[in-house]
Regions:
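Short, basic-rich loop-to-helix N-cap that marks the start of a DNA-contacting helix
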Residues: 45-55
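Short alpha-helical DNA-recognition segment
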Residues: 21-40
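The alpha-helix within a helix-turn-helix
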Residues: 17, 28, 57
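A short, Lys/Arg-rich alpha-helix, primarily the initiator
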Residues: 1-22
Length: 73
């Protein structure tokens, strides 16, 4: 991979919540996390850990792969 290519991992948590009619507040209550943390994840400002992604997938009853979008830039 060249120096100007890197893998960027983005989540589609905001879309997954919207598809199920769920809110950031609902997810924060399910996971015991702050709404601010959920908001930052949804905005892709920070990424949840793999463990957290597994917990989110479980709560939303989706495959963890459905929460990720891999792009190259």
């Amino acid at each position: 991979m060249s120096n100007n290519q890197q893998n960027v991992m983005l989540n589609r948590l905001k879309a997954a919540l919207a598809e199920q009619g769920k809110t950031n507040r609902w997810l924060s209550e399910q996971l015991g996390k702050s709404e601010n943390t959920i908001s930052r994840w949804c905005a892709n400002k920070v990424q949840p850990s793999i463990t957290q992604l597994n917990e989110i997938a479980s709560v939303l009853d989706v495959d963890v792969k459905d929460l990720l979008v891999s792009t190259k830039s």
